[in-house]
Every structure is written in structure tokens, then in C-alpha cells.
Amino acid sequence: MTKTYHIAVLPGDGIGPEVMAQASKVLDAVRQRFGLKISTSVYDVGGAAIDRHGSPLPAATVAGCEQADAILFGSVGGPKWEHLPPAEQPERGALLPLRKHFKLFSNLRPARLYQGLEDFCPLRSDIAARGFDILCVRELTGGIYFGQPKGREGQGMHERAFDTEVYHRFEIERIARIAFESARKRRSKVTSIDKANVLQSSILWREVVNGIAADYPDVALSHMYIDNATMQLIKDPSQFDVLLCSNLFGDILSDECAMITGSMGMLPSASLNEQGFGLYEPAGGSAPDIAGKNIANPIAQILSLTLLLRFSLGKDDAADAIERAINQALEQGYRTADLAGDGHAIGTHEMGDIIAKFVVEGV
């Protein structure tokens, strides 16, 4: 009997509803082609939820997500809500509580330079010509952002501020397994990023990662210091497959990976817990300046759906079909404004239609 899956859809603010509508088209195409039983429910989140319910994350939204197999998230925030106290603003009041509530400890950020988009890569042309396809696996719940003690004390010239980098063995083990399992489905290479020549937390990180690697003899492991990694990403990103990073180092490298692709409109993101439940979202923001103009690139949102199908639902064939459809659209010259340069640009809705069509046709 075919299992029925349920997705909680949270469009959010800005371009969120527009690009989410395109992901919904592609989901319909996947259902049609593969006979999948996937239902969806739409819930308010972010600024839209503040306007309707007085809270960026209403209880009904959380309850709906609890009943789902995964969350497909749009984007939140905008100048309309910047006057609110920081904790009540859409970004901090919605996304962070969702991550905490569902214990999402791992963040996966693919960064790929698609064929035909080399001119948008800021790297030297000979480097861009080699292409790259990187998955940045970042630990989300430990490290210096959450370690205690932290604070400020003293006055005048003796005032000081401090943060604490703390990692437990279990935190490193579980994120390392995510990286190695992901590498098995890719090119079987993991590069673990640390600062083991200086930091005790990085020494433990390296020891634990080496131990986990013994369970994956088919995956090649290398270690790289964070300062060298930032340089190597610019020098030759094609050398990397899966980057395994702590919270701080992953924050830095995932944004660097994003920048060298040439467009934030192409970058999805997945945040997972130990049960495989995930929140999937574009890596970019809500872009309120272009909302409602039919010019936003929906591919990041569509690729977020691809990650959802792959990691939470285990539907690799459907995920592969969407990725092939996106490749086909780009290879045939279809571009939204962020990728068109001086050439012809199509709209948000048109790009969604084309990708959905290619999914159904099975290109």
C-alpha cells in the first residue's frame, strides 16, 4: 500500500508566497509522474502571521507542523516589522523557535555552479569553468553561539566580553554521520573543517570525526583548518564534495559557498533532526523590494522541495527528476532576471511552469 505523506507549507513574507506557488506546481508534477500520495496544509508564519494572529509563530502553525512529515518554509521578514522588539520580529520569532522546537541540529546547504551560469560566478573564468558541487553540513545547536558562560563584565579599560566554544562528543558524532551518509550518495569525499592546531574543541572534533570515519571505509576523509578552507574555496572549489563544519565555521563557509555560485536564488537549505524530520527553505531572504513583481527566482524554493523529497521522504527518484528538469530549463536558456544579464528574462510563474512541465515529461 502506498504511504501517504503530509507536508506543512509555510509561505511567509515577501517573495515567499510567489516562489512557494512554483514549488507547489512542481510538487503537483511529481505527484502526477510518480503516483506519490503527498498532501499539504498551508499555515501562516512570520510577518503575515503577526498581521493575522499577533504572533510570528502561532500555536496553530506549530501544531500543524507537528502533524506533518516535513516543513516546506518560504521566507520571513521585511521593513514593515522592523519596529518590533527583536524577539518578536519575524526572523527571530519564527525560524529560531521552530528549529528549537523540533530539535533541528544539522543544516545542509548545497552550493552548485550550474552549467551555463559560469559568467555569474565571481571567481576567475578558468576556475569557474571547472564547476563545483558542494554540500556544506553544519552543526546547528552547539559551539560558540550557545556555549556558556558568555557575557560582558567590568568597566572602562577593564571591561571585557567573552563567549565559550563547547562541543560534546555526541554532538560531533551525530553531525559527522550526517556528513558521511550524505557523501555516500554523492562523490564519497568528506572534508572536515576545524582549528585543531589551536582549539581544544577542534582537537576533540577531529578525534571524533576520525572515529566515525572508521565506520565508512568507502568515504575518503581529509581535515582542513578553517583559514585554509576559506582560501581553498576561492582557489579551487571543485576539490570539495562534502564539507563537515561546526556551527561557527559552517556559518562562515556556507555563506562563502553561496556567494561563489553567483545567485542566492539558486540555493536551498535543509535543517534536520535525529528522526529525519526537516525544515526546508531557500537560503536567501524575503526580498520585499521585488515581492509581487513576478521577477523572483523560484529555483531555490523548488530545490528546497527536492531536498525534502530526498531527506525526509526518501523519494530520490522524484528529487532526481526535479533536478534534471531544472538542468534542462537552464540548458535551454530559460532565465529569471537575476540570471539573465542583458538577455531575455522570464517571470517567476513562467519558470515554475517550465520546470513542472519538464518533470512531467521526464527529461
UniProtKB/Swiss-Prot annotation:
Mg(2+) binds at D227, D251, D255. It comes from the Bacteria. Binds 1 Mg(2+) or Mn(2+) ion per subunit. Gene3D superfamilies: Isopropylmalate Dehydrogenase. Pathway: Amino-acid biosynthesis; L-leucine biosynthesis; L-leucine from 3-methyl-2-oxobutanoate: step 3/4. NAD(+) binds at residues 78-91, 285-297. GO terms for cellular component: cytosol. Disulfide bonds: none annotated. Its main location: cytoplasm. PROSITE patterns: IDH_IMDH (PS00470). Substrate binds at R99, R109, R138, D227. The record marks Y145, K195 as: Important for catalysis. Keywords: Amino-acid biosynthesis, Branched-chain amino acid biosynthesis, Cytoplasm, Leucine biosynthesis, Magnesium, Manganese, Metal-binding, NAD, Oxidoreductase. It catalyses: (2R,3S)-3-isopropylmalate + NAD(+) = 4-methyl-2-oxopentanoate + CO2 + NADH. One of its GO terms (molecular function) is NAD binding. Its EC number is 1.1.1.85. It is found in: Cytoplasm. One of its GO terms (biological process) is L-leucine biosynthetic process. Its cofactor is Mg(2+); Mn(2+). Homodimer. Catalyzes the oxidation of 3-carboxy-2-hydroxy-4-methylpentanoate (3-isopropylmalate) to 3-carboxy-4-methyl-2-oxopentanoate. The product decarboxylates to 4-methyl-2 oxopentanoate. Belongs to the isocitrate and isopropylmalate dehydrogenases family. LeuB type 1 subfamily. PANTHER family: 3-ISOPROPYLMALATE DEHYDROGENASE. This is 3-isopropylmalate dehydrogenase.
